[in-house]
Amino acid sequence: MLQEEVEDAPAKVYGIGELRNAGKSASADSVCPDAEDIATIIFTSGTTGKSKGVMLTQNNLASNVEAVKITAEPGTAVLSVLPIHHAFCLVMDWLKGFSLGATLCINDSLLHMVRNMSIFKPDIMLMVPMMIETIYKRLAAADTSIPKAVLAENVFGGKLRIIFTGGAHLDPYYIDRFAEYGVEVLEGYGMSECSPVISNNTSENHKKGSIGKPLENAEIRFENGEILVKGS
């Protein structure tokens, strides 16, 4: 029945086998996109009005990936816990991670995040401030007789060294608290329309309570209380 419905569909539907066979005969050049081709459409959160579909080109995404200065050894474990349809996760976790040769581990549910941290033992994670605050509540509720190194092993998996965060303001209090467990929290700022990172802190250059310095390909100015950004 499903096969019949597929055959009657208004759009052409390809089976996995068909796509695999087509790929065998295709050259690399035949699937190379143009820099100005639309790569994805990301919908905004609707902070200042109705949610909008943001059309990001191949060049938009590639420029952002290249401009974000993060260093990591190939094989670095990244646990992806944010939705991939958000630009922050798509670019920072997936595209930047792949460009560094990272091993991307996909979280199946926020309910399982802490469990999966102990399973995958990530080196780097992206989180929104609410996640950081929630994890700290768990740390703060633990028995005070448990050494912090042991608690960090149990909660974070023992290898977590950096959390990149954005999307909302993070109280600097949590940056200090996570540092006690050997985890560096680095804030950044961005928006979907900017592919999305505009500024970020790095391990080599950071300031607590700051969203970091603008990326090399971004120009920022303030006008009538608004932040105006131009980039590639």
Please tell me what each predicted stretch does.
Residues 123-126, 136-206:
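Gly/Ser/Thr-rich phosphate-binding loop
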Residues 1-35, 139-154:
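ANL superfamily adenylate-forming
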Residues 62-77, 84-150:
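Conserved AMP-binding/adenylation subdomain of ANL enzymes
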Residues 209-214:
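Short Gly/Pro-enriched turn/cap motifs at secondary-structure boundaries
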Residues 1, 53-55, 80, 102-109, ...:
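Short beta-strand->loop structural element characteristic of the AMP-binding/adenylate-forming
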Residues 221-232:
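AMP-binding/adenylate-forming core of the ANL superfamily
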Residues 39-65:
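Conserved AMP-binding A3 loop
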Residues 24-43, 50, 72-77:
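Conserved pre-ATP/AMP-binding loop-to-beta segment of ANL
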